[in-house]
Amino acid sequence: INKAEQRFKVEKANISSEGESIFIKADSRLVRINLKDICYIEALGNYMKIYTQEGRFTILSTMKEIAEKLSGNDFVRVHRSYLVRLDKIESIEDHYIKMGAKHISIGKAYKEELTSRLNLL
């Protein structure tokens, strides 16, 4: 995973959405990432880490910019630092989401939005 992160260090956010995929500027080229491959996105200051099934990509962007680009694409903001893909959620317990070995906290301000986006029986 570290090799993938080093290879895809991003100089600038430059995200463009095209239906089922997004392009991010990695080094001096644009890299296509399929939206269905994104598990979650984590904010780290002015940088965002996009976690996919193949690895992770670091970009210079804000959570607000990414959330706007991915709105309506099966992603929901669950914390001020996390945006998750709904179909990658394995379970929700108390105040966190389980996605494989990763546990992501659910912020109080985002819990209602998450609940409304789930297909509850």
Q: Can you name each region flagged by the protein language model?
A:
Residues 2-103:
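Conserved binding/recognition cores within well-folded domains
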Residues 113-121:
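C-terminal output/interaction extensions
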Residues 98, 105-108, 112:
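C-terminal structural segments of small proteins and small subunits
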